[in-house]
C-alpha cells in the first residue's frame, strides 16, 4: 500500500515536469518507469501515461507491479505508428495529460511512455520537457554508433541490461566510447534496471535537470 501522507501537506506552485520515455520494443521502458516511480513516489506526486498500439498492456504491467496506485496510470491505445502519437500528432497524449491533471492537479511529474519504436523516435516539445531514451545491450554493441535522434538528442540516454553483455558478445567499453562520441557532453547511464544498478543516476538526473533546475 502506498503512503500518501506526505502528499496531503504539500503546496504545489509549479506546473508538472513532463518526461518522455522512449526506446525500442523490449529495451526496458516499462521497467524503467516502474523502478523510477517506486523510488520517487510518494515523496513526489507522480502520474504515468503509457502508449501501446493496440492494447493497454504496459498500463496493466505497471499496475500489477505496484509502481503507482492504479488511478495514477492511464493507458493510451495509439493505433498505427507509435512515434506519430508522440511527435507529429501528440493530441491523444495531450488529452490524456489534461485528463490526469484534472484528477491530480498537484502532480510534480507526468511520465509519458511511448510505444516501442526505432532510433528516429522523438517527442514533440509540447509533450515533453525532458526525454529519456533507453536501449538494451542485447540489441547489439553497434546500436550507439548508429545514431538517430533518440541516441544523439535525448536529454538522458540509458543503456540497459549491462549484465547480458558477456552472453551476446557485446563490449561495454566499446558501447560507452561510441556513446561519448555520438553524444558529446550529453549525459548517459549504463545500467541494469532489474537489479537497480544505475537507477540512482537516473533519479538524480530527473531531480537536478528537471524538478530542481532554476
From Swiss-Prot:
The keyword Chaperone applies. Gene3D superfamilies: P-loop containing nucleotide triphosphate hydrolases. It is found in: Cytoplasm. GO terms for biological process: urea catabolic process. Keywords: Chaperone, Cytoplasm, GTP-binding, Nickel insertion, Nucleotide-binding. One of its GO terms (molecular function) is GTP binding. GO terms for cellular component: cytoplasm. InterPro entries: CobW/HypB/UreG_nucleotide-bd, P-loop_NTPase, UreG. SUPFAM superfamilies: P-loop containing nucleoside triphosphate hydrolases. Its main location: cytoplasm. HAMAP family: UreG. Homodimer. UreD, UreF and UreG form a complex that acts as a GTP-hydrolysis-dependent molecular chaperone, activating the urease apoprotein by helping to assemble the nickel containing metallocenter of UreC. The UreE protein probably delivers the nickel. Facilitates the functional incorporation of the urease nickel metallocenter. This process requires GTP hydrolysis, probably effectuated by UreG. Belongs to the SIMIBI class G3E GTPase family. UreG subfamily. This is Urease accessory protein UreG. It comes from Bordetella bronchiseptica (strain ATCC BAA-588 / NCTC 13252 / RB50). The gene is ureG.
Amino acid at each position: 500500500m502506498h503512503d500518501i501522507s506526505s502528499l496531503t501537506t504539500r503546496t504545489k506552485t509549479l506546473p508538472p515536469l513532463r518526461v518522455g520515455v522512449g526506446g525500442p520494443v523490449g529495451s526496458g521502458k516499462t521497467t524503467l518507469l516502474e523502478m523510477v516511480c517506486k523510488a520517487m513516489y510518494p515523496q513526489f506526486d507522480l502520474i504515468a501515461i503509457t502508449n501501446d498500439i493496440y492494447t493497454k498492456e504496459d498500463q496493466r504491467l505497471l499496475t500489477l507491479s505496484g509502481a503507482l496506485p492504479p488511478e495514477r496510470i492511464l493507458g493510451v491505445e495509439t493505433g498505427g505508428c507509435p512515434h506519430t502519437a508522440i511527435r507529429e500528432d501528440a493530441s491523444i497524449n495531450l488529452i490524456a495529460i489534461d485528463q490526469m491533471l484534472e484528477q491530480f492537479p498537484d502532480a510534480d511529474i507526468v511520465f509519458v511512455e511511448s510505444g516501442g519504436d526505432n532510433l528516429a523516435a522523438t517527442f514533440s516539445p509540447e509533450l515533453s520537457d525532458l526525454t529519456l531514451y533507453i536501449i538494451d545491450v542485447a540489441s547489439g554493441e553497434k546500436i550507439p554508433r548508429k545514431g538517430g535522434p533518440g541516441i544523439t538528442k535525448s536529454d538522458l540516454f540509458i543503456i540497459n541490461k549491462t549484465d547480458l553483455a558477456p552472453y551476446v558478445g557485446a563490449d561495454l567499453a566499446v558501447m560507452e566510447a561510441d556513446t561519448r562520441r555520438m553524444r558529446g557532453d550529453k549525459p548517459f547511464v549504463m545500467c541494469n534496471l532489474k537489479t537497480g544498478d544505475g537507477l540512482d543516476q537516473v533519479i538524480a538526473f530527473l531531480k537536478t535537470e528537471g524538478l530542481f533546475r532554476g
